């Protein structure tokens, strides 16, 4: 629970605030940044929850603003931080971008939202689609009678009644993000797959959906075998529309979806993943005045798949200059601000191998401890369509709407991409 | 107090021309112009301009039937409700009227906003509409009313309790609508906690059924609330507890991390009751969702890691030996990396030690200074915990000595002291590096560790007396910590080597400590040693000083009682700080009261300023033009209800409060876990 919510800019100036409980002096917000830097000074880093003189500061950072909740009680820290994140999401949905300027341009709307998403410091609702039904940007359209959407307080709090589409369709995207840390010798130190099933629902009425996956637990429980592989998900998370008790009982994923786009479920597997794209990087320092890099990149996934927009970010010494690049494919850019060179490859087919050679000058005044050079990993970005690392498959998506009885088509796509961390240590 | 500068900018006078322009807009005959004007007024208010002189004009728009306009005026009111509630009383009749509206949005809005006006006088007006709203046919209104009860309770406990509002709120717990139930239990829980003896909200088994139904129908925030209420449920009946836990388990699959962790909380509260089979089952269910929290936003990860740390202390085997998931990512923020290091240390055991060590070795060459330091400390802890790995650790430390980067060398030296206490025979490996390392040490911790090493192993280190005499030459400039360590070190040196070779050195140090130093501790200790070192006592001295040291072992766990208390506080700030709530939310009522007083005081100052502004403003007569029937409510210069505390009094209260700063409940570091005599002599 929060006593007050603030939006601050990076200098600590309050852009907008809402005092929900009037039980703490609002001026304590001025302590926030000094307190944060004091903690940073003391222990070298700051944490998302700080306490000072009986006031707790709970905050997140997004673009050029801080979202800060103050409380003088032993509040639920997890709830507050998740709430602040969701609040940021609501602002992004409304203003496209959350930054100082977008808040300043929309004071009134922000106040209105702050009034609705939280009451007396208790989070109420953060479902943008429902909020948008009665807190609107088109301020001049005067609605005479706008009752609160029934969904606000309903058991189905994410979908309104009376939705109609001429053509009923569902688009299903299975997106797998691969996190991987590998050592230079090729051993995988850590790897995990974070999968997500994203739905775009254009369906009329109150449709009832059932999703079938090649879930190992489901098939083992039923004692059945199917053609092809099954996958074992270590943990699954569902959008609030999914009936959790039913899933716990018989692994059935059944739900009434929200309208439009949403993430239906996410799953995690920490099974050992072979690196999809492998990069070897060798560097030689020539007579102390120049450094030469030989880089080899290899696509180790299925031959018929193609990785798009591959980016290989290779760290170089911070004081290197005058780069020269030679490559069999793609093009290389020097990015001095991150002390790295970035090798871009538009299309990288499975089984292919590409090479790159780079040469850079080193300053004549030599850094004493060159061997002490801090090691930074090679990082990768990519997307491989029509491919999942885990082998997960959508077997069916059954759509029934008892009243309207229409026929709807589901469309399925798959893609694998890099996660927040896909790096090869040097 | 509000600094001068802040005040002046906040109450910057609003330009006359702008004011009159807005004023014109506010009384325009066209709705859209009025809406626009209110909007601009609110925008001006937000950027810190004082628009309180427009109050009467804004208020005129309240009687509108246009919901958009009404909402805007309410927003304006909420903002001023804080600074001058008595002005808001002017609007009270409209509120009462709105609470009878046909449109539920309006009814709810009126109840919600009225609750935000923090002045006792409002209660009289609020009572009837609130009573009706609690029985309203529309759940949206009931949900707002449920929260409004706690708002009223905050204003006037007596009134709220004696007029049946709490009973009405209790009835809402069995409301058919899940969101209403959630708000009702949340309000009740808070009212209960302010006065636990009254027992307003005791979760009993019969209530859990209703809560379970609401749980599966509620939105994410409602679920968190209901789970937190279920965590308040206490029973000694295993069947009941099992039933609750079983029905909470499906919530582990919810996408909202708050729901997941709250579900964990319910389980952790009840888990001590269960048989080992059911306990195993629950922990097994809990482990994957806890690990999934590590792939969320960093801040959420942080809370998860702090809680995992607690659960891991209770149940070290919960993740088997899976250390890998806790390995640091290059892009992790520092605060995450530090938490992960702690957990890696906790998980270290013979089964995973190889990958742990090779991972830690990789971290040593990372960029962030604090991270590298913590890694070195972590390596030392692992060496204490898993004896089989000591040689690997020492070889990493020696590699760092080879590299000779001063901050790393210093950290290693500090850790070395601890490691050598457990594995004294490893000193041989260190010998070649000592004289070079000593030059790199600037940090007092590292220097005193070095002094300890030189003293303790003076019989093995051939150059010990030379190195110590070098350190002693600058003794007068050193920190106390180092001086004490040096004193003990030379005494050990002389006693171990005997023969009186180092007599001169000892005398020099004793002489400095007794005659020159102004520090009592140092002097007293020097006197003690001096007496010990007399020829007739030498044997006893040897026995005392060169005795067998109690061994150190790795134990970073919290005390049992504290841990158990914190496990009932999962997801809260207490679980993040690893401190009991009492230690940081101000010493009981006293601290909280002081804060409240300061809040009130600040309001009063702002209010006084605003009053001044209004009185100066040209609009004062307009106030009287308003058609309000309640004569008592129109006086704009009513004195604030809550009288200001004398400033000095409140300040001293704050000072006192600060003096009560939370005592650190953190456990003593392993190094410090020495015996009492040991401490006394600084051995």
UniProtKB/Swiss-Prot annotation, chain A:
- Which InterPro entries does the entry link to? Adaptor_comp_med_subunit, AP2_Mu_C_sf, AP_mu_sigma_su, Clathrin_mu, Clathrin_mu_CS, Longin-like_dom_sf, MHD
Q: Which GO terms describe its molecular function?
A: clathrin adaptor activity
* A GO biological process held by the record: endosome to plasma membrane protein transport
Cell location: Cytoplasmic vesicle, Clathrin-coated vesicle membrane; Membrane, Clathrin-coated pit
Q: How does it sit in the membrane?
A: Peripheral membrane protein
- Coiled-coil blocks: none
Matches recorded under SUPFAM superfamilies: Second domain of Mu2 adaptin subunit (ap50) of ap2 adaptor, SNARE-like
Limits of the MHD domain: 167-425
Question: Under the cellular component aspect of Gene Ontology, which terms does the record hold?
Answer: AP-1 adaptor complex; cell division site; cell tip; clathrin-coated pit; clathrin-coated vesicle; cytosol; endosome; Golgi apparatus
- UniProt KW keywords: Coated pit, Cytoplasmic vesicle, Membrane, Protein transport, Transport
Oligomeric form and interacting partners:
Adaptor protein complex 1 (AP-1) is a heterotetramer composed of two large adaptins (gamma-type subunit apl4 and beta-type subunit apl2), a medium adaptin (mu-type subunit apm1) and a small adaptin (sigma-type subunit aps1). AP-1 interacts with clathrin. Interacts with sad1.
Its biological function?
Answer: Component of the adaptor complexes which link clathrin to receptors in coated vesicles. Clathrin-associated protein complexes are believed to interact with the cytoplasmic tails of membrane proteins, leading to their selection and concentration.
Q: Which family does it belong to?
A: Belongs to the adaptor complexes medium subunit family.
Name of this protein = AP-1 complex subunit mu-1
Q: Which organism is it from?
A: Schizosaccharomyces pombe (strain 972 / ATCC 24843) (Fission yeast)
Q: Which gene encodes it?
A: apm1
From Swiss-Prot, chain B:
Biased composition, Polar residues: where in the chain?
632-649
Gene Ontology terms: biological process = endosome to plasma membrane protein transport; retrograde transport, endosome to Golgi
Which family is it part of?
Answer: Belongs to the adaptor complexes large subunit family.
Residues of the region (Disordered) are 629-649
Give the matching Gene3D superfamilies.
Answer: Leucine-rich Repeat Variant
Pfam families in the cross-refs? Adaptin_N
Give GO terms: molecular function aspect only.
clathrin binding
List of residues that carry Phosphoserine: 675
Q: Which gene encodes it?
A: apl2
Tell me the protein's name: AP-1 complex subunit beta-1
